[in-house]
C-alpha cells in the first residue's frame, strides 16, 4: 500500500478519535455566579462554606455574590473569616454585610416571615439576578445556607445538564426536599405519588416539576430567562404584556412567583437525582428555637454517616468550631453494641454514629460463628431444640446464628452478675431514626409509668398479620407480636433473669425466634411447648426507633448469620425461602415516626407550604 495512503488512513483515524472525545475537554467550564443570602446561620455556616469550597469546579470560573443582614449571631464573623482565607480563590466576590440590622419590622422571631422580610428577600434576589446579567455569567446558582452540598461533583453535574432551570435533589431528615411535584390552583403544595418515587430514587434522572427552590441553577444563556422574576408585580406586568389569563393572584412568595414566572415564559423547571448531591434543613416555624435547627443538623449528620461513611470534614480554619452533643446513656445503666472482631469497619461506623448523635455505648465482642465447632459447642453444653428448622429456609441453625445467640446470652449473664437494671443492646448494622435520643427516653418513661416491663424492641421486623394492642397509658408502645431481628432492644434485669431461667442453651434456637417464644407470641406450638414458662413482658416502640442499614439484595448487604455454616441435623424438604432480612414485611407506616411533641417538626409547614 502506498505510504501516502497509509498516512492518510492514520490521520483519518486520529481525527475520528479526537472528534469522538467529549467536547468539554477542549472548552472552559461555564462561568457561574453563586448567589448567597445568609441570616442567622452561624451553626451551619462552617459546614456550608466548607462543602461549597470543596466543589470540584474551577474556582476561577466562579463569582460569588454574598449578602448578610438581620443576623444576631456570628454569621458575619464566619463569612469574613471565609473571605479572608478563601475569597481570592474565586474569580470575583461581591459582598455586603449589615451588622446593624438585626430584625425585621413586625418580626417577633428570627424564623418568622413578615411581609417586610419577603419584600427584602425578593429585592436581593432580583439584585443578584441583575448582577449575573451584568457580568455575563453563564449560570446563576441561587443557594441557601441551609444546603450542604456534600458531593464535590454537584456543580459539575448540574452545569453539564445544560437545562434552563435545574435543582439538585436534596435529602432531609424526613420527606421534605427542595422541589414539588404538584401545585394546587391556589399555589400550595399538592401531594403526588411521583414525589416519593423521585425522592427515594425509584426512578433516576432529571424530571420536570412545577417548583424548585433553595438550590436552583439558572442557565442565563437561555433566551427566555430574561423574563424570570421573583417579584409579583413584575410577573403580573409580564402577564399583562402577553395578555395571559388568569393573572397571578397568589402570595408575594419569592419561590412561588419564580415558578409561575418560569411557567408563564415556557421555561421548564427540573429536579435532578442522578447523584446524592447533599442535604437540606427544613425551614423553622415562628415558635421554634435555634435548638430545633441544631437537632436537625444532628439528624443530618447521622444520615451522612450511614450514607457516606462519615461526615465530610470542615475546612481547617473551621475545625475548632465543630461541636458534638454530650453523650448520654438514655437513663439506662449501660448501652452495648455487639460487634465481631473481624468487622472493624462496622464498629468504626457505629462509633461515628454514637459520636454524632451523642450515645454513650460500649463495644461488646461478639461470639464469632466462624470460630465455633461441634466439639466446642459440646464442651459449652450447647444442645439444639429437637426438630428446629428455619421457618423459611427449612434448614438447621447456622454457626453464625449460634454465635449471635451466644453474644446476646453473654450480655444477659453479665446483667445478672453485675445487677444491671436496664440495658440497651444494639447490633452493628443499624440506622437510627431522627430524634432517637429524645424519643428513646420518652418511650422508656412511658414503659416505666405504664407497667413493669421485661423487654422493649426499638427495632425489629414484625409480621403484617399480627395483632398488637397498644399498651395502656402509653402513646408509643404496643404489646409485641411475633417478630424477627434483634437490631436493638432494652432488657430489664427481671427480663434477663426470665430468659436465663429458661435454660436456652439446653434447647438452642436463634435469638429472634427465642424471644417471641418467651413472650408467648410464637406461631409454632411445638417449639412453644419446649419452654413451659413463657411470661416475658415484651413491648415494642411504635413507630420503631431504628432500622437495618441494608436489606437483602441491596448493595452493601452482608449477613454473618444466614450465610454461615449449618450444623448437621436433618430438616424437611425445602420450600420457598425468604430471608429474615427481607424488606417486604416491614410496615410502611412505621417509617413515619411521631416526633417529640416539644419539637413539633413533624407537624409543621415550611415557608414553601410543603407538607412533611
Swiss-Prot record:
Carbohydrate attachment residues: 106, 227, 263, 524
Assigned keywords, A-Z: Endoplasmic reticulum, Glycoprotein, Glycosyltransferase, Signal, Transferase
An example molecular function term from Gene Ontology annotations: procollagen galactosyltransferase activity
EC primary class: transferase
Signal sequence range: 1-20
Sequence motif Prevents secretion from ER, location on chain: 609-612
Keyword S-adenosyl-L-methionine: no
Gene Ontology terms: cellular component: endoplasmic reticulum lumen
InterPro entries: Collagen_mod_GT25 (IPR050757), Glyco_trans_25 (IPR002654), Nucleotide-diphossugar_trans (IPR029044)
Compartmental location: Endoplasmic reticulum lumen
GO biological process, one term: protein O-linked glycosylation
Coiled-coil intervals, chain numbering: none
Enzyme Commission code(s) on record: 2.-.-.-
Family membership: Belongs to the glycosyltransferase 25 family.
Name of the protein described by the UniProt record: Glycosyltransferase 25 family member
